[in-house]
Amino acid sequence: MLLKNVHADLLQLANEQIAEHSQRFFKTGKGEYGEGDIFLGIRVPVLRKLVKKYRGISIAEVRRLLHSKFHEERLLAVLMLVQLFKSGDE
């Protein structure tokens, strides 16, 4: 199951300083538009590299990522769906 590998990679790449900055940037405080969003602290270019690494991931696993509590896992799922759409035959 690739999903366990994806999650492990993301946890290894997590950066507390970036996560703290992202929480402020995305306004995650009480009553703010991003209230409760949880960040691992991984920049978008790094996530794009993971899209390439996990090109063979199933739609079911991508769907599970979409329901993650972590912002970066959800974003990774969206980036994976975009890649699947681009590589589709129609």
Predicted regions and their residues:
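Alpha-helical scaffold domains
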Residues: 1-90
